[in-house]
């Protein structure tokens, strides 16, 4: 709900600050006083394009600001949270238009684009009467209103989910197809696999091959080492280890009886001779196993060379070649299965399309019923509002393609015939601001109780009417004001008398320059203003009495 509006150096306004409450607020005043400037200011705060002509003569810039109260779950609050502009429970819009033509905008004291300002304003205020900023002229907004009237949230959610699922499957298929023909890639990898599969790439086998290569490469040195070690341990000369151990054992045996501790030494020497014998036996076995085989060594080196060449090619170690081979085999298998996967995706896409059509059909049925009901109710109201023979038709038009659309199978177009015999035309093509305001009023009254924009502004709604029709227009605006905040600029006393709150705009000459001023009227001032609207500049007793009667009738409603 709009709580506060500040207008500075805007057109003929120097500085005004207005407070607004719930219900219906009317704005009246003499012709040319600037009644519509409030609505113009709200339009610019809603993102309308502006030029320097709106800046008061002699001022450097015009400054506009508005403050709205919004609940935590209000769509405007959700929008603010999504763009990280939320601030407590209030929403502040600010716009500066410079005399040089420049313009800047803020939401909650943070700079924003006019597009962002406009997006937020669609959740805050609906201005009826000027084509350039009337959300109801948008076909998307018409569809939103129709769906709200139909109360088909469940059906809409089902359609949106079905469309999203279909789109996700389509994206997956497109991604697969974007990879192109896999035959070349398969042939290339299969050639590499054949190369790898020629070799035994088992890591244990490669480890054993390396060990065998080391032995073959050092066989001569191993044989020589075995011979020398055997000679050292048990040679023919008296300096071999085994001969010396025997000599030492013999020397001790002659004196052991004199010191029992020497028996332990004898035991250790016996063990040493046993271990030397075992070492000699193992050396003999190893020596016999060692054979110099140049052909076998060459074969081993060739195979190791091939393994290292493959490892360099695939940028891994020889021990990792088996894992590389398995990865490539898996990739080939995956690519071979792509056609199968694409066929499965096509089947799932077809099923998703069927589910969307089923959901969209249910949504279309609810919309068709709601369109008929809303059209009938609105048509009756249009005729009540002085547009005899007028008719509203709500047309559901199929989308041009058969792709699942998240909004369903059709678009909406509100068509209006304002006079008998005239063909219905799109609502957005109505030339008369007064007719457009009354049609909008009829639609809004027909849709009472729906969760629509909280603040509704009507300009020119009473253009070209009077008498009983004016009274009906006032009643409908008053009824709308019971559930929404309504701001109405009017020149008709029957409409002005229906407001909960009344502002008067007047022209005041200051230093030879005409300026607009606005004031909130109390009950006495209000009666005087309505009497002026009834009788002109010179207020008669009859006009004063008639004004009092209009206000009294409101209290008795």
Swiss-Prot record:
One of its GO terms (molecular function) is ATP binding. Keywords: ATP-binding, DNA damage, DNA repair, Nucleotide-binding. CDD domains: ABC_RecN. GO terms for biological process: DNA recombination; double-strand break repair; SOS response. The keyword NAD does not apply. It comes from the Bacteria. Pfam families: AAA_23, SMC_N. GO terms for cellular component: bacterial nucleoid. Disulfide bonds: none annotated. The keyword Cell membrane does not apply. SUPFAM superfamilies: P-loop containing nucleoside triphosphate hydrolases. ATP binds at residues 29-36. May be involved in recombinational repair of damaged DNA. Belongs to the RecN family. PANTHER family: DNA REPAIR PROTEIN RECN. NCBIfam families: PRK10869.1, recN. This is DNA repair protein RecN. The lineage of its organism: Bacteria, Pseudomonadati, Pseudomonadota, Gammaproteobacteria, Lysobacterales.
């Amino acid at each position: 709900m709009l709580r506060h509006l500040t207008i500075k150096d805007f057109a003929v306004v120097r500085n005004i600050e207005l407070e607004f409450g719930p219900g219906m607020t009317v704005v009246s005043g003499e012709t040319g006083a600037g009644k519509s400037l409030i609505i113009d200011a709200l339009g610019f705060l809603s993102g309308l394009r502006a030029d320097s002509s709106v800046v008061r003569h002699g001022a450097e810039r015009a400054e506009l600001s508005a403050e709205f109260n919004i609940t935590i779950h209000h769509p405007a609050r959700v929008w603010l949270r999504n763009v990280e502009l939320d601030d407590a429970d209030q929403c502040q819009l600010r716009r500066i238009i410079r005399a040089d033509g420049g313009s800047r905008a803020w939401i909650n004291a943070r700079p924003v684009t006019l597009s962002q300002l406009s997006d937020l304003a669609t959740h805050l205020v609906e201005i009826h009467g000027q084509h350039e900023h009337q959300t109801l002229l948008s076909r998307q907004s018409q569809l939103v209103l129709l769906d709200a009237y139909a109360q088909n949230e469940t059906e809409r959610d089902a359609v949106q989910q079905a469309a999203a699922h279909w789109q996700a499957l389509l994206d997956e298929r497109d991604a697969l197809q974007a990879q192109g023909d896999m035959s070349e890639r398969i042939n290339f990898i299969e050639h590499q696999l054949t190369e790898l599969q020629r070799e035994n790439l088992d890591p244990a086998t490669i480890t054993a091959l390396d060990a065998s290569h080391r032995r073959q490469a050092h066989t001569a040195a191993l044989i020589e080492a075995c011979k020398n070690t055997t000679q050292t341990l048990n040679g023919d000369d008296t300096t071999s280890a085994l001969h010396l151990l025997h000599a030492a054992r013999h020397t001790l045996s002659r004196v052991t009886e004199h010191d029992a501790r020497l028996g332990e030494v004898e035991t250790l020497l016996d063990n040493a001779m046993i271990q030397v014998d075992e070492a000699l036996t193992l050396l003999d076995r190893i020596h016999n196993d060692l054979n110099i085989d140049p052909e076998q060594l060459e074969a081993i080196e060739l195979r190791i060379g091939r393994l290292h060449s493959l490892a360099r090619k695939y940028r891994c170690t020889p021990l990792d070649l088996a894992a590389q081979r398995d990865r490539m085999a898996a990739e080939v298998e995956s690519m071979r299965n792509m056609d199968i996967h694409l066929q499965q995706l096509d089947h799932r896409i077809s099923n998703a399309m069927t589910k969307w059509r089923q959901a969209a059909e249910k949504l279309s049925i609810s919309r068709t019923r709601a369109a008929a009901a809303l059209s009938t109710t609105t048509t009756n109201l249009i005729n009540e509002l002085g547009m005899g023979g007028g008719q509203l038709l709500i047309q559901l038009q199929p989308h041009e393609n058969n792709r699942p659309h998240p909004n369903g199978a059709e678009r909406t177009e509100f068509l209006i015939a304002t006079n008998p015999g005239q063909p219905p035309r799109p609502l957005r093509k109505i030339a008369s601001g007064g007719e457009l305001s009354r049609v909008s009023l009829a639609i809004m009254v027909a849709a009472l109780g729906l969760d629509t924009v909280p603040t509704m502004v009507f300009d020119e709604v009473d253009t070209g009417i009077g008498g009983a029709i004016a009274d009906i227009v006032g009643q409908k605006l008053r009824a709308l004001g019971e559930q929404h905040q309504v701001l109405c600029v009017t020149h008709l006393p029957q409409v002005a008398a229906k407001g909960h709150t009344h502002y008067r705009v007047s022209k005041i000459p200051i230093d030879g320059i005409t300026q607009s001023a606005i004031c909130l009227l109390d009950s006495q001032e209000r009666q005087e203003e309505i009497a002026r609207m009834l009788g002109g500049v010179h207020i008669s007793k009859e006009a004063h009495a008639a004004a009092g009667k209009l206000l009294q009738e409101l209290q008795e409603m």
